[in-house]
Curated annotation (Swiss-Prot):
Cellular component GO terms held in the UniProt record: cell outer membrane; pore complex
Binding site for Ca(2+) 1: D199, Q211, D213, D215, D250
UniProt cross-references to Pfam families, sorted A to Z: Plug (PF07715), TonB_dep_Rec_b-barrel (PF00593)
Record domain TBDR beta-barrel: where: 155-614
Protein name: Vitamin B12 transporter BtuB
Membrane-crossing segments per the record: 158-165, 169-178, 184-195, 217-227, 232-248, 263-277, 279-296, 309-325, 328-337, 353-369, 371-381, 385-400, 403-417, 434-443, 449-458, 473-490, 494-509, 517-529, 535-550, 558-572, 585-596, 602-614
Gene that this sequence comes from: btuB
Binding site for cyanocob(III)alamin: S85, N92, V110, S111, A251, T309, R517, Y551
Membrane topology category: Multi-pass membrane protein
Gene3D superfamilies attached to this UniProt entry: TonB-dependent receptor, beta-barrel domain, TonB-dependent receptor, plug domain
Family from the record: Belongs to the TonB-dependent receptor family. BtuB (TC 1.B.14.3.1) subfamily.
Localization in the cell: Cell outer membrane
Amino acid sequence: MIKKATLLTAFSVTAFSAWAQDTSPDTLVVTANRFQQPRSAVLAPVTIVTRQDIERWQSTSVNDVLRRLPGVDIAQSGGTGQNSSIFIRGTNSSHVLVLIDGVRLNLAGVSGSADLSQFPVSLVQRIEYIRGPRSAIYGSDAIGGVVNIITTRDNPGTELTAGWGSNSYQNYDLSTQQQLGENTRATLIGDYEYTKGFDVVAKGGTGMQAQPDRDGFLSKTLYGALEHTFSDRWSGFVRGYGYDNRTDYDAYYSPGSPLIDTRKLYSQSWDAGLRFNGERIQSQLVSSYSHSKDYNYDPHYGRYDTSATLDEMKQYNVQWTNSVVVGHGNVGAGVDWQKQTTTPGTGYVPEGYDQRNTGVYLTGLQQLGDFTLEAAARSDDNSQFGRHGTWQTSAGWEFIEGYRFIASYGTSYKAPNLGQLYGYYGNPNLNPEKSKQWEGAFEGLTAGVSWRISGYRNDINDMIDYDDHLQKYYNEGKARIKGIEATANFDTGPLTHTVSYDYVDARNAITDTPLPRRSKQMAKYQLDWDVYDFDWGVTYQYLGSRYDSDYSAYPYRTVKMGGVSLWDLTVAYPVTSHLTVRGKIANLFDKDYETVYGYQTAGREYTLSGSYTF
């Protein structure tokens, strides 16, 4: 409570009276500037998803959670567990930084982008989602935005959940948090998920050979955490989790060769930390280790056959973050150290390599009357490409009580991945991709409607593209992204409304052609209400047209995929104070659409679940 009260006083959040009505004083955000601050004091657009939201939406995957959020466009090669890409504000999927409890997701080190189709939604207790550049705070990848998945559970007790659904879907979950003495608490989560899936078809991606089979998914997850409070100011934690996933997919068929159409992923992560929370100073030291083994193989031969591939990576992280209350704001500073190592063959790199990065950052936030000022700078020293610096600044002006104008500018970058550097077609002389981004926004509270309208431009240079003639990767691409984002939320009696609209013009700046797999327009609407103890929810999504490549034709051609409107319906009912039953119909009107050309989506799906708490 000392920490919370100090922060609220330091930022003088009473000046933001309008936002205080929309955001509880208890709603604190960590991800925006790497220290706790009230959401009303954050100048960047931020969305928070809680475990209660996930349960109300009855989401069975992290992608299903993220697709509801402003600025997020997801392209997936089929159903649950199939490869997916996350585009935030039109940027590449490799331009999205995904954190797990503040630490980079290990799987992103091989491909350069995070595929959240494999991460268990059962571990997600909270998501903090920041849009816009954040490399000045986090380093590489944070061009389009940052998604921080937080696994720390806050509510004690035990919950048992079981669910069933279409395509033989099954899910069984146990989560418990217990107090061990006065100052120690332990958390344990176990989860099993299975679906037979459906035939994703993969037109054009199978070597002209149809593969009429079900492409299923199996996941087993285990999580444990121990937290201890040493005193009023000192606390520490140890936690670890792992998951074992198997995915069937449609693969490229070559006559006389094994058909590699099965993926087996083992992933484990461990971290430990020590925290100090003083009246004016906060400090945290975290050390983490993660190890992933990603096999692709023909099940008739097994994952140890010479035809199989293995991407294996180990990642070591040490983070020391600090913040000090200064005046009517805060100054933060910290150091990040990371080492990534791979085994031979990972990412088609014939030899094993390691890459080290040390980053030092400084942040500042001050509230001066009606003005809020924010700035950050960072320097990264990478073992491959040397030093790289980034910076950003923002200013907010409450020109009328309850109405604020925000302007920001930031630079960011994306480091080349190991395959681009050292693979068969790699180029060790690659430079990082660089971004410059501008944004202007108005936000306010009008007649009970909390709203924000933003306009932004993002120029990305030195993008890494594969040169067909030279058969190497080079820094020769450019992108120009312009967009408008509007969000609003309000209540009308028992009804709660959340609305967003995105217009994104993402183009190749050299050819002036649209970037693939991005919708030019998106509209999203969430309606929730309670009637006679029934908790109802309706989700609407409009995904505009997008472009992709048809590889079934030679030479391949660009195709335009039409837009689609999707509806989901959910309902939950508390049978007793301990037992709740839930039901969901996804894609209510059974729309046939694709987000990756040639790959089918699920169509209408049903799920039914029950949870018992004690």
